[in-house]
Amino acid sequence: MQNHKKIKNKSNQKSTALFFQNLNRNGKDRIILKDLINHLNENGLSKNDPRLNSFFSKINQMNGINEITFEEFDKLLIESKDLFEKMFRDQLVIPEFKKFTHQIQKIYAQVKLNKNGNVADYIPQLKKVSSENFALSICTLDGQRFSLG
């Protein structure tokens, strides 16, 4: 059993190193925190995701540091490693979330032009709502979120 843990730990360390290298665009063995956060956002994961509370709490404790080393990166991910691993391996429910949201924006713009129909007047709360109000929200099982309107 102990051997299995060592193998799994080595495997996790390798994948974390791979993720780090993918974000290491400046070649200085440091990554820019903003790039990591942008990667989260592009995949539909936000600051409001409770699984990322520890991650963002640690970032806030860094007092404005812009770049981090591999060791700091590894410590940041430790409590959300499974989520980050799914994200970096494009294994979230919607792997190319950015492309997906672009398509949704196009559909939303087309549907919003449709002025047919009426607001449901048999629901008292809806009677008072403007027929111009229109919104769309998506939340996947992995917690990827996107909203318009």
Predicted stretch roles:
Residues 65-82, 125-128, 140:
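Short N-terminal signal/transit or membrane-insertion segments
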Residues 32-34:
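Short acidic, hydrophobic short linear motifs in intrinsically disordered regions
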Residues 37:
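Globin-like tetrapyrrole-binding proteins
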Residues 112-148:
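A short, well-structured edge-of-sheet supersecondary motif
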Residues 2-30, 43-72:
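Primarily EF-hand calcium-binding motifs
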Residues 70, 74-115:
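Low-complexity, highly charged intrinsically disordered N-terminal segments
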